[in-house]
Amino acid sequence: MSETETRPTNFIRQIIDEDLKSGKHSSVHTRFPPEPNGYLHIGHAKSICLNFGIAQDYQGQCNLRFDDTNPEKEDIEYVESIKNDVNWLGFQWSGDIQYSSNYFDKLYGYAVELIEKGLAYVDELTPEQMREYRGSLKEPGKNSPYRDRSVEENLALFEQMRDGKFKEGTICLRAKIDMASSFIVLRDPVIYRVRFATHHQTGDKWCIYPMYDFTHCISDALEGITHSICTLEFQDNRRLYDWVLENITIDCQPRQYEFSRLNLEYTVMSKRKLNQLVTEKLVNGWDDPRMPTVSGLRRRGFTSASIREFCKRIGVTKQENMIEFSSLESCIRDDLNESAPRAMAVLEPVKLVIENYEEGKVETLNIANHPNKPEMGTREVPFTREVYIEQDDFREEANKKYKRLVLGKEVRLRGAYVIQANRIEKDEAGNITTIFCSYDEDTLGKNPADGRKVKGVIHWVSADKALPAEIRLYDRLFTVPNPGAADDFAATINPESLVVKNGFVEPSLATAEAEVGYQFERTGYFCADNKDSSADALVFNRTVGLRDTWAG
């Protein structure tokens, strides 16, 4: 962090400041604990920036821990993807990567301790019976008929569970807390269940697995986490978090703090809905540039700096709110406006022939890579007798507000000459196929000698030297701000969320690196696709337009 940059403030940082000042903690230790059962999205990025950012700013530590207690839904592919996303966002975890599965032996021991204290019991209610016994927000729960088993019987049964003597769904270990609690999470929650599943870290060593609420708090304590930060849906779970730690023999007593999760307009972040988009092929995979996944945003051309800035701007509160999608777009637009070199691309070409320009001549023009940053240098752009311009940049007739090329009028080609449109050719359907022009040879890099004013400037590429490219125009995936609230969210998908154009780009883009942003002049910000683009077949993704077309 630079000296001029101010450290963000929020209620969590205020708590940390007080804890350090009072001597409650001498240092700060946070963690980011994803379950490896899917790809990270921008909501996770908010949590990553918060937890790793706090560790950075307070010269503390932040662990990356995989909460891997559900082997049927987890995969090493997700582990690797999450590691890559955290690194790409600009963060590095402290020490080795942690896994909750590293603590399975200790977790088993703590479960035995609860049984020995009379605070856990083996239950044989069916899942349906357990739901019935649990009660509701208005009705207290009922005690299981197995609740008062002896410590000895519970220990023996739990050992048999571990040894694989029971079928899945027939038996579990529950904490003995209070079936009449006003908090349903405290109504004797399940803390271990039988699962005959191969685990990606521990193989077939275990056939019983601890539940998240039991595992999470103990993992935090074993790692010396000082501030366990999670989203608001875990607010009630804090009571169970504290209960577990207060009733086992463990040194560290972390505290859990909750903040509001990210809700972003025009997208969904529910894992179930995102999975539906992929499995029903409504998008092209988890890294589709329309997806809110970190890999999708990265492929679209969002920079890690822009996502960090977005997370900084939206802040950290306990208040649930919906963030405008334009806020995210503003961050990447601000970033690329400063950093992206300029280039020219024509998405809907029409040929323009300069009749008084020498046939076969190729002129090399040096054009600035950035209008305000001479240190970014120049690039060579070939100029020839025939060029392509955008169809929208020409009209046969137009009013004075139209500042582009009009029949009989002049315009400047960006970085090149002033030209005048003299005549056109059309096909049988009436579409313009060719615009015939003349150029003023004495206007390269300067105004016409006779002082006439030429106000319009349009971009172009050489028809002979330009490279064909597939241009993917990405837009918001949904047509409504809150698609998750719709009865059928898939019905609100924006049919214009991907429009493909076959255009031409200037030759300098032949070596464009994937994910590196360019401003296609007068069009938007683009990057080469990180999967489909190659030297033989260029593919560019639109990251964001030059301005917010959804405003107002």
From Swiss-Prot:
It is an enzyme of class 6 (ligase). A motif ('KMSKS' region) lies at residues 268-272. ATP binds at residues 35-37, 41-47, 231, 261-262, 269-271. Its EC number is 6.1.1.18. It is found in: Cytoplasm. L-glutamine binds at residues 67, 212. The keyword ATP-binding applies. Its main location: cytoplasm. Disulfide bonds: none annotated. Monomer. Belongs to the class-I aminoacyl-tRNA synthetase family. This is Glutamine--tRNA ligase.
